[in-house]
């Protein structure tokens, strides 16, 4: 069915509408302080109340507070007429001045919030994070398009089946009455200026054909429509395709699931306010739109319900509709509103949008049941516009700190990622060697920083030395556990000596061979755990060096592979050297030796410590006689004294061996080996062969860093307002 476009000025009002507002006591005070230009579009309640709620802008005094000036009594009708004309002129000047002040303060407080998010969305920030938005969803024929038409003042595509086939960003901007209507539609790299409201419908249809094709398919690609008019609220909405249950001809059979998937992707974001449109003449509990909103917002914290078609409700069900709007049936934190927009018959009869708003108010004013909703500001398009603007601005202010934090974090990560793709391979042969030299130089610098424990960190990264220290702390705990194990095993070993090996010696004489055996056995138990620590450290160091190759050579697969091969070869060599060194250390440890003065100092300290404790709590002597307790205690003192020195030695020596061979020598040899690549001139072109995806990734990351930097600057500029 073809629709008649409205070629009149958007939102042009019938002449008697001003009188209608004056007749309504609720709007009487407002009418006195608003110019006819603001009144004629039906949005007069938006100009003042929005400022009250969102920016606390003081309004001119109400009618009760009006100031009256004494007027001397006139003697002639002509003088009285002149006085009336003069008073009317002054009144109009006062109204215009008040309007100008309100508009300027409104522009300073409200418009920047919405413009900020619009500018971030225009930069493409939604590719990186979610932005505050109001998404409009509803089943087919729910009245969704009619609401958007009433808010925007323009006709949108209508027809059978799925008409909205792409997300439509509808940016409404209120401008002074002195300026003319203008619009702009943008999609992909196309941007078209619109000179008249009548051009909007065809412009949207053409844009959808380009983005989604001409066969009824849908697309998740955004189309942006900007409308600047004196007769629209300051608001940005995202219109989504209506939820379909049956595919039309030429449409995929799963078109319904495609639409639901697209809708769910957008309304799932916690930054999105979901505007759910439901007709009054259907069971609200069964509507697919509300069901989807409840799935992503179970508590209803960011869902606003809009009831349409109140003129089609069955007689006797009005109270049920009122209970829904009063939030008594399916509670939503943001509540419900009800509106009456143009129907298909109204469009066929060429009813203008302005007249439809006029008829909507008359409907609610005269309805015996629904008039109470008008008194509560829960009905009509103007009140809906006011509600949506306030909700959006409050939501933007609430989420700005989170948005700034997310942009900062994503920007930092993107800059770090871009370092891998800093620039492409030179085309001039003489520059290639210098380019490779720079790459290897930067890589070697990072290796040196790792060796010194001074590498640059991003986010929650942990320095390699911090990881190695944990491994060496584990080694220290193993030594303590081994020393405790020795003390517990001494009584049984001494009993074995008494029972099997003591010959003509008197009881109480310490056998040095037994002492040596105990020491050697416990030292031997530490050798394999030391090798485990070595392997753990090798793995951590290798992972760090491989991470550096991916950081510097990610887009040069041959160079990256060459560096990884060198890391693997050097790793094996250094691991073998370190293991041999550790095993030699334990071979020496099996020689029981200590300087006399050091040993005697440790022995005195050990005996003093033991005497200061209740020896019965230290060791159980149930397996030996009391007469042997003294020389067992003596053996414990000697072994503990020796292990004190040996543990100190091993606690430092094993980590030093590992750090020397596996970190320092590994890193130094890797740097030297990478420099050798510069001498292999015949491999130069092969080493610098760039991956096919590298240039694409570089461009992507550069664009991302660019838009995030601009977005961050926008937020900084906004915070200075």
UniProtKB/Swiss-Prot annotation:
<dbReference type="GO" id="GO:0005634">
    <property type="term" value="C:nucleus"/>
</dbReference>
<dbReference type="GO" id="GO:0098793">
    <property type="term" value="C:presynapse"/>
</dbReference>
<dbReference type="GO" id="GO:0008017">
    <property type="term" value="F:microtubule binding"/>
</dbReference>
<feature type="domain" description="GED">
    <location>
        <begin position="632"/>
        <end position="721"/>
    </location>
</feature>
<dbReference type="GO" id="GO:0005525">
    <property type="term" value="F:GTP binding"/>
</dbReference>
<feature type="binding site">
    <location>
        <begin position="138"/>
        <end position="145"/>
    </location>
    <ligand>
        <name>GTP</name>
    </ligand>
</feature>
<dbReference type="GO" id="GO:0005737">
    <property type="term" value="C:cytoplasm"/>
</dbReference>
<protein>
    <recommendedName>
        <fullName>Interferon-induced GTP-binding protein Mx</fullName>
    </recommendedName>
</protein>
<dbReference type="GO" id="GO:0016185">
    <property type="term" value="P:synaptic vesicle budding from presynaptic endocytic zone membrane"/>
</dbReference>
<dbReference type="InterPro" id="IPR027417">
    <property type="entry name" value="P-loop_NTPase"/>
</dbReference>
<dbReference type="Pfam" id="PF01031">
    <property type="entry name" value="Dynamin_M"/>
</dbReference>
<feature type="region of interest" description="Disordered">
    <location>
        <begin position="1"/>
        <end position="22"/>
    </location>
</feature>
<feature type="region of interest" description="G5 motif">
    <location>
        <begin position="340"/>
        <end position="343"/>
    </location>
</feature>
<keyword id="KW-0963">Cytoplasm</keyword>
<feature type="region of interest" description="G2 motif">
    <location>
        <begin position="163"/>
        <end position="165"/>
    </location>
</feature>
<dbReference type="GO" id="GO:0005886">
    <property type="term" value="C:plasma membrane"/>
</dbReference>
<dbReference type="GO" id="GO:0051607">
    <property type="term" value="P:defense response to virus"/>
</dbReference>
<dbReference type="GO" id="GO:0031623">
    <property type="term" value="P:receptor internalization"/>
</dbReference>
<keyword id="KW-0342">GTP-binding</keyword>
<dbReference type="InterPro" id="IPR022812">
    <property type="entry name" value="Dynamin"/>
</dbReference>
<comment type="similarity">
    <text>Belongs to the TRAFAC class dynamin-like GTPase superfamily. Dynamin/Fzo/YdjA family.</text>
</comment>
<feature type="binding site">
    <location>
        <begin position="308"/>
        <end position="311"/>
    </location>
    <ligand>
        <name>GTP</name>
    </ligand>
</feature>
<dbReference type="Pfam" id="PF02212">
    <property type="entry name" value="GED"/>
</dbReference>
<keyword id="KW-0547">Nucleotide-binding</keyword>
<keyword id="KW-0539">Nucleus</keyword>
<dbReference type="InterPro" id="IPR003130">
    <property type="entry name" value="GED"/>
</dbReference>
<dbReference type="InterPro" id="IPR020850">
    <property type="entry name" value="GED_dom"/>
</dbReference>
<dbReference type="GO" id="GO:0005874">
    <property type="term" value="C:microtubule"/>
</dbReference>
<dbReference type="Pfam" id="PF00350">
    <property type="entry name" value="Dynamin_N"/>
</dbReference>
<dbReference type="GO" id="GO:0003924">
    <property type="term" value="F:GTPase activity"/>
</dbReference>
<dbReference type="InterPro" id="IPR045063">
    <property type="entry name" value="Dynamin_N"/>
</dbReference>
<feature type="region of interest" description="G4 motif">
    <location>
        <begin position="308"/>
        <end position="311"/>
    </location>
</feature>
<feature type="region of interest" description="G3 motif">
    <location>
        <begin position="239"/>
        <end position="242"/>
    </location>
</feature>
<dbReference type="InterPro" id="IPR001401">
    <property type="entry name" value="Dynamin_GTPase"/>
</dbReference>
<dbReference type="InterPro" id="IPR000375">
    <property type="entry name" value="Dynamin_stalk"/>
</dbReference>
<dbReference type="InterPro" id="IPR030381">
    <property type="entry name" value="G_DYNAMIN_dom"/>
</dbReference>
<feature type="region of interest" description="G1 motif">
    <location>
        <begin position="138"/>
        <end position="145"/>
    </location>
</feature>
<comment type="function">
    <text>Does not show activity against influenza virus or VSV.</text>
</comment>
<feature type="binding site">
    <location>
        <begin position="239"/>
        <end position="243"/>
    </location>
    <ligand>
        <name>GTP</name>
    </ligand>
</feature>
<feature type="domain" description="Dynamin-type G">
    <location>
        <begin position="128"/>
        <end position="401"/>
    </location>
</feature>
<feature type="compositionally biased region" description="Basic and acidic residues">
    <location>
        <begin position="1"/>
        <end position="16"/>
    </location>
</feature>
<dbReference type="InterPro" id="IPR019762">
    <property type="entry name" value="Dynamin_GTPase_CS"/>
</dbReference>
């Amino acid at each position: 069915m073809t629709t008649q476009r409205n070629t009149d000025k958007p939102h042009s009002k019938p002449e008697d509408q001003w009188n209608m507002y004056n007749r309504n006591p609720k709007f009487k005070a407002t009418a006195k302080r608003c110019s006819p230009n603001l009144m004629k579009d039906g949005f007069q309640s938006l100009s003042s109340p929005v400022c009250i709620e969102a920016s606390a802008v003081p309004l001119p005094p109400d009618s009760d507070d009006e100031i009256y000036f004494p007027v001397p009594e006139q003697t002639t009708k002509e003088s009285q007429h002149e006085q009336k004309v003069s008073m009317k002129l002054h009144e109009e000047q006062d109204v215009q001045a008040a309007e100008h002040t309100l508009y300027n303060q409104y522009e300073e407080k409200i418009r920047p919030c919405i413009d900020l998010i619009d500018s971030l969305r225009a930069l493409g920030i939604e590719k990186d994070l979610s932005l505050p938005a109001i998404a409009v969803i509803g089943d087919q024929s729910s009245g969704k398009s009619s609401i958007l038409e009433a808010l925007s003042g323009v006709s949108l595509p209508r027809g059978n089946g799925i008409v909205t086939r792409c997300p439509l960003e509808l940016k409404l901007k209120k401008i002074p009455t002195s300026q003319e209507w203008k619009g702009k539609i943008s999609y992909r790299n196309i941007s078209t200026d619109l000179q008249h409201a009548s051009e909007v419908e065809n412009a949207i249809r053409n844009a959808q054909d380009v983005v989604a094709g001409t066969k009824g398919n849908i697309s998740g690609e955004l189309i942006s429509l900007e409308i600047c008019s004196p007769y629209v609220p300051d608001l940005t909405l995202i219109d989504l395709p209506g939820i379909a249950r049956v595919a039309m001809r030429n449409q995929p059979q799963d078109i319904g699931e495609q639409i639901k998937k697209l809708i769910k992707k957008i309304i799932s974001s916690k930054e999105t306010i979901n505007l759910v449109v439901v007709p009054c003449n259907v069971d609200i509990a069964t509507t697919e739109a509300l069901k989807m909103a409840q799935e992503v917002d179970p508590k209803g914290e960011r869902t606003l319900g809009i009831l349409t078609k109140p003129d089609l409700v069955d007689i006797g069900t009005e109270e049920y509709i009122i209970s829904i709007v009063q939030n008594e049936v399916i509670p939503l934190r943001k509540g419900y509103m009800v509106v009456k927009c143009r129907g298909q018959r109204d469009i066929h009869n060429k009813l203008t949008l302005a007249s439809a708003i006029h008829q909507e108010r008359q409907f609610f004013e005269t309805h015996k049941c629904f008039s109470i909703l008008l008194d509560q500001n829960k009905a009509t398009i103007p009140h809906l516009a006011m509600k949506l603007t306030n909700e959006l601005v409050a939501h933007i202010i609430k989420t700005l700190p989170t948005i700034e934090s997310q942009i900062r974090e994503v920007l930092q990560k993107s800059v770090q990622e871009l370092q891998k793709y800093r620039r492409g391979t030179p085309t001039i042969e003489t520059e290639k060697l210098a380019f490779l030299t720079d790459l290897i130089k930067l890589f070697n610098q990072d290796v040196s920083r790792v060796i010194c424990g001074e590498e640059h960190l991003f986010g929650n990264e942990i320095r390699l030395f911090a990881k190695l220290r944990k491994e060496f702390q584990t080694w220290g705990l193993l030594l303590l556990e081994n020393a405790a194990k020795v003390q517990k095993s001494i009584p049984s070993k001494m009993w074995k000596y008494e029972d099997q090996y003591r010959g003509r010696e008197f009881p109480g004489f310490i056998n040095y061979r037994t002492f040596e055996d105990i020491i050697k056995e416990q030292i031997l138990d530490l050798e394999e755990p030391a090798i485990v620590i070595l392997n753990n450290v090798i793995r951590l160091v290798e992972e760090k060096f491989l991470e550096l190759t991916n950081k510097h050579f990610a887009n040069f697969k041959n160079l990256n592979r060459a560096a990884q091969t060198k890391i693997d070869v050097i790793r094996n060599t250094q691991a073998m050297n370190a293991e041999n060194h550790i095993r030699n250390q334990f071979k020496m440890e099996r020689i029981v030796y200590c300087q006399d003065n050091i040993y005697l100092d440790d022995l005195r300290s050990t005996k003093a410590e033991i005497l200061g404790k209740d020896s019965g709590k230290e060791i159980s002597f149930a397996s030996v006689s009391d007469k042997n307790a003294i020389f067992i205690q003596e053996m414990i003192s000697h072994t503990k004294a020796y292990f004190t020195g040996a543990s100190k030695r091993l606690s430092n020596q094993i980590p030093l061996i590992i750090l020397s061979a596996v970190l320092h020598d590994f890193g130094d040899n890797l740097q030297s080996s990478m420099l050798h690549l510069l001498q292999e001139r015949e491999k130069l072109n092969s080493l610098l062969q760039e991956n096919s995806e590298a240039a694409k990734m570089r461009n992507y990351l550069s664009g991302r860093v660019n838009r995030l930097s601009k977005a961050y600057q926008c937020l900084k500029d906004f915070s200075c307002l």
